[in-house]
Amino acid sequence: MKKWLLAAGLGLAMVTSAQAADKIAIVNMGNLFQQVAQKTGVSNTLENEFKGRAAELQKMETDLQSKMQRLQSMKAGSDRTKLEKDVMSQRQTFAQKAQAFEKDRARRSNEERNKLVTRIQTAVKKVANDQSIDLVVDANTVAYNSSDVKDITADVLKQVK
């Protein structure tokens, strides 16, 4: 009787694990993120958003470099002292604006990245629910997967569109 119960329990465990394996899928999040970012034009949006400020910084840098070259060729005098103060002030202003620019650009980039991640996660959940999948794992974190594991990357990409 004990052997029969043990065999029945083992058989039930194998059936349960086989059913669980059918409900696992993988998705390539890196690939999805890259493709969705290209399709939505996030990089172009960010580039256009910061184009004016980047041009202003480039102009300031060019102007500062020309003043520094003039300063190097000048001899000591009141004009040189005035130009030195102007260059120091402009260098400080440039550094502050450049730092603010980088900070704003990084913040906006993170905002857009988070929006994309949210869209992708929502699509993954929808595809998983539609296909009765219990567990979805990022393909990049899996050391090995058999050919039995379903890859839903293409389905998720269609859903995100």
UniProtKB/Swiss-Prot annotation:
<feature type="region of interest" description="Lipopolysaccharide binding">
    <location>
        <begin position="97"/>
        <end position="108"/>
    </location>
</feature>
<feature type="signal peptide">
    <location>
        <begin position="1"/>
        <end position="20"/>
    </location>
</feature>
<dbReference type="GO" id="GO:0051082">
    <property type="term" value="F:unfolded protein binding"/>
</dbReference>
<keyword id="KW-0732">Signal</keyword>
<dbReference type="Pfam" id="PF03938">
    <property type="entry name" value="OmpH"/>
</dbReference>
<comment type="subunit">
    <text>Homotrimer.</text>
</comment>
<dbReference type="GO" id="GO:0050821">
    <property type="term" value="P:protein stabilization"/>
</dbReference>
<dbReference type="InterPro" id="IPR024930">
    <property type="entry name" value="Skp_dom_sf"/>
</dbReference>
<keyword id="KW-0143">Chaperone</keyword>
<comment type="function">
    <text>Molecular chaperone that interacts specifically with outer membrane proteins, thus maintaining the solubility of early folding intermediates during passage through the periplasm.</text>
</comment>
<keyword id="KW-0574">Periplasm</keyword>
<dbReference type="GO" id="GO:0061077">
    <property type="term" value="P:chaperone-mediated protein folding"/>
</dbReference>
<comment type="similarity">
    <text>Belongs to the Skp family.</text>
</comment>
<protein>
    <recommendedName>
        <fullName>Chaperone protein Skp</fullName>
    </recommendedName>
</protein>
<dbReference type="GO" id="GO:0042597">
    <property type="term" value="C:periplasmic space"/>
</dbReference>
<dbReference type="InterPro" id="IPR005632">
    <property type="entry name" value="Chaperone_Skp"/>
</dbReference>
